[in-house]
Amino acid sequence: MIEITQVNASLDEADDENACLIVGKRVAKRVLRCKDSEIKSIELHRKSIDARKKRDVHFILSFRVELTSPHLEREAVDSVAERDRSRVRAIEDDEPSFPSPASDAPQERPVVVGAGCAGLFAALTLAEAGLKPLLIERGDPAFRRSQAIDLFLKERILDPESNIQFGLGGAGTFSDGKLNTGTKNTRPSPYPRNLRRGGRAPRYSMGCQAAQLAPTSFPRLSPLYPSASSSSEVSSVIERSSSTFASTRLAPSPVLMSNRPKTPLASQSRQSTSSSPAGILLAIFFELLKDHNVALAQKTFAMGVRIEHPQCDIDRAQYGASAGHPALGAAPYKLVAHLPNGRSVFSFCMCPGGQVVAASSEPCHLCVNGASLNARDGRNANAALLVNVTPEDLPNDDPLAGIELQRACEAAAYRLGGSNWNAPAQLVGDFLAGRASKTPGKVKPTYPLGVTWTAIDEALPQHIVESLRLGLPLLGKKLRGYDRPDAVLTGVETRSSSPVTVTRDRACHAVSTPGLYPCGEGAGYAGGIMSAATDGIRCAEALIADL
């Protein structure tokens, strides 16, 4: 396999994947000095937008080329001209591999608690190794989750056990599925490849600079998510070797107090079950862990608001005269401002052409998130606008103090919205002036249950409010119009990251409880679906190595 990088292409000649492949084949023949018949396959590996010069917005592409024989590939790489050597290299196929099935797998079945990205890929890895894991998830399968969410949006009736946060697939099922990651772990992730393998992910999305899957895609991803037609024990990608229990909640049990979990694992479900686990991979349930003396620690997390602008304004600010070109689509952004008070304000989970979503999971507690559909053609752009909360900002050293702060902010947001699931909202101009908003401007909020115009100060800690007021004008200097007076702030965004770490060692063991393997975003070891999937695999491999 040969990789060719730094291929410049105009917007018109690379407007879709087929056009990109035509460019790639032309470049491959020239750079590798090969014939059409010698190219066995070519794949668009990366596609990013270079908008540093607004008068010359173009794509930068990279390709992976397979010739008809390894000998030809070696000759082709050796023959590359000096001017092209820096962007051509021979590579090994980075298809990630799962552990080989164990011939002497123990009778005890490992238990994976939580079926988000970490839990799903932990279970998949264990199943590939022949260990027949039990996968437990408090919420419903994706189809029933969709029904519960529809009921919430239509009737304002929240199901605390099945909602945007809880259910098979995790919170990412009904938010943006961003297929990029900032993690320093260079290990190839199987996540996008498995999505493609299932035939349900848009092929073009895999190599894009800001690749994502829309929430409408997630419930249909058959290789990852269990069937919508089953009952409490549902079929899944690992149906041949594991069991998945949806609508099942972990209950107190001696399992978490033993030196090695061998006692029955209790659960609360429509149909009860128990297990003598070989090990437990756990994604959250902090109160249960604290009650059983599992070591927890506070960690830095972030809270703030969702900010909305007209997408056309973001397009013009990012792409200049090229804004609106069909090859570009809706423009994303990523911003940060470092403040005189030593803190930072930053955007997170930006959703081009998206909407603000109702992400609440607890009665009388309101929080928001964002999502884009595949077309990214909504009128508004939105992103979380966040400020960090450090352990020093918390009132005490209780490991769950951050969770209590989150809950207090969500309860305040619910009250400010009118205690009817309306979200509190404020215009940027009013927020900067310190006055409550009364009516919208030209930017119409997209939160689906409606907003109540107010002042959002009461729903956030004072240091976050002050930092947002300092940061918005600075961000307006970085992206024209970002601090426009009628941009909409909707509160509150509290769930961007976990405020708690379930402390583990380098081998992924919970330091206080052998046989327990904390993993994923909820346990404090990931920051998105890609890093969570990778961490789930890592912890599963650690469990396998310990058997």
Segments predicted by a language model, with ranges:
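Residues forming the flavin
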Residues: 1-59, 65-174, 178-547
